[in-house]
């Protein structure tokens, strides 16, 4: 039996080793979160004391509704009150985001997702994916339905999924969705003032037999660098090179790019599907290939001003280690 209590103040335990683990959700009351009622209270029980101030911006409900979630704080327990305007036939998710922390200010690494429903079932559709390029704190925005780009700035997303280098999200309805990646998403700014990355298609469709695997890419801010001609010449033996061939369904021109946080090396795929990149600095790299629709040698990720989405890109499944005076061969990389 779960006993709730209140007191004048909640104090963190004294002494002991420094806590570096984020809080964990132990249980909910009720344990089964279907057939709920409008305005029902749900108790969240954690394994340690939660910092009360962190709750203010940590509890979200998706799909978004106009009414806020109210909560009461009891140290290791938080009682939330559901809005009174939920749809009977929808699955909602309570998302505890990375603002949530314990009394030692240790924040969540990943969102805690709690599916709930006023009906007797929970939706089962899901998406997953990875983020590539240079970014700080990306989020995935989902709108249910096929939404025209011109309407996105004026429409609140139905779901906001916090991410790092990868993401997954479930309990969605089987339907079509418009999807967008945003770095350092700030809902107080107009959407076009955020850093955006579109998917390669206008929409995704979730079915029982299809869990889309979505890739997004964020480019670095453009910075022009002037090369000092006195320092360009280096011993060729200090470099590595990479050769390979690509098979699959693609449309030329295709740019093959080898990149890490410090360097980027590019070449075009030849008509016979072969590529070679010379004079590569030693290091660990990711290998990309993308269909360069506008021939600018940049992986364009779309914008709100026209109908273009992200250029379709592919990522070699393993990271590559290149060493000086050494050639790495990539055989039969399959892309589709």
Where do the model's predicted regions map?
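Sec-dependent bacterial lipoprotein signal peptides
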Residues: 1-7
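Short Pro-Gly-centered beta-turn/loop motif in secreted/extracellular proteins
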Residues: 163-186, 272-294
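Calcium-regulated, polybasic anionic-phospholipid
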Residues: 252-255
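A short, Gly/Thr-enriched small/hydrophobic beta-strand-prone motif that recurs across taxa
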Residues: 120-134, 222-250
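Short, contiguous acidic/charged loop-to-helix segments that flank catalytic cores in large enzymes
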Residues: 232-234, 247, 265-278
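Acidic, low-complexity Ser/Thr/Gly/Pro-rich repeat segments typical of extracellular/periplasmic
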Residues: 7-180, 193-199, 257-271
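Structured interaction patches on ligand/partner-binding surfaces of diverse proteins
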Residues: 110-111, 185-224, 293-330
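Primarily interfacial, aromatic-capped hydrophobic alpha-helices that serve as membrane anchors
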Residues: 241, 326-336
């Amino acid at each position: 039996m779960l006993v709730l209590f209140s007191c004048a103040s909640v104090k963190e335990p004294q002494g002991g080793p420094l806590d570096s683990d984020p809080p964990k959700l132990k249980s909910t009351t009720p344990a089964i979160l279907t057939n709920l009622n409008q305005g029902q209270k749900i108790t969240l029980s954690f394994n340690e004391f939660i910092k009360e101030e962190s709750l203010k911006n940590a509890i979200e409900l998706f799909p978004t509704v106009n009414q806020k979630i109210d909560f009461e704080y009891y140290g290791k327990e938080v009682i939330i009150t559901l809005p009174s305007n939920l749809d009977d036939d929808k699955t909602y998710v309570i998302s505890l985001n990375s603002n949530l922390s314990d009394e030692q200010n240790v924040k969540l690494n990943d969102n805690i997702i709690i599916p709930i429903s006023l009906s007797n079932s929970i939706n089962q559709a899901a998406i997953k994916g990875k983020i590539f390029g240079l970014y700080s704190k990306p989020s995935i925005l989902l709108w249910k339905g096929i939404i025209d780009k011109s309407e996105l700035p004026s429409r609140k997303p139905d779901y906001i999924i916090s991410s790092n280098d990868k993401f997954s999200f479930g309990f969605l309805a089987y339907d079509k969705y418009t999807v967008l990646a945003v770095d350092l998403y700030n809902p107080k700014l107009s959407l076009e003032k955020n850093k955006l990355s579109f998917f390669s298609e206008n929409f995704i469709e979730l079915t029982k037999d299809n869990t889309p695997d979505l890739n997004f890419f964020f480019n670095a801010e453009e910075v022009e660098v002037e090369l000092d001609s006195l320092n360009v010449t280096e011993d060729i033996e200090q470099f590595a090179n990479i050769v390979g061939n690509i098979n699959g369904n693609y449309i030329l021109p295709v740019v093959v790019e080898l990149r890490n946080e410090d360097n980027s090396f590019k070449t075009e795929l030849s008509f016979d599907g072969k590529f070679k990149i010379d004079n590569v600095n030693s290091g660990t790299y990711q290998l990309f290939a993308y269909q360069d629709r506008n021939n600018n040698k940049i992986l364009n990720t779309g914008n709100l001003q026209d109908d273009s989405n992200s250029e379709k890109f592919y990522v070699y499944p393993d990271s590559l280690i290149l060493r000086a005076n050494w050639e790495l061969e990539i055989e039969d990389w399959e892309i589709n």
